[in-house]
Amino acid sequence: MTITLTNGGTTLSLPPDLIWADELTWSAVAQSTERGIFGTLIIDAMARNGGRPITLQGDGDSAWIDRGTLRTLGAWAQTPGLRMALDVRGEIFTVVFDHGPEEETRAIAMSAVIDYSDKQDGDYYCSLVLRFIEASETL
């Protein structure tokens, strides 16, 4: 099965061995609790509209991708709020890149297979990590 990311009319094929690391950890329910003045537990719960994290990552030295594709992904990541269609093995999501609250959290991470000094678009990188957030209806 394939993994693709589409921006407008441009579709990029992503490495098929990417693993959706946080697929089963997200909850569609937001909940908060507090105590009333008589000690009664008050629970507020509601359905979330978007915001699901989608982290696709390679395992070890897998998830090879060429530098040219990485450059395209990097250009897309530099467009704030850019909505894209992510197809993960037949499931389609509208996503934006997740830049995270910290400088250490990057939307795209990878390692060079061989670190050439004169990099070419055909050079390969591995251990790819792509961080997305599923866009809400109102984003």
Enumerate the predicted regions with their spans.
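Extracellular/virion structural assembly segments
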Residues: 1-139
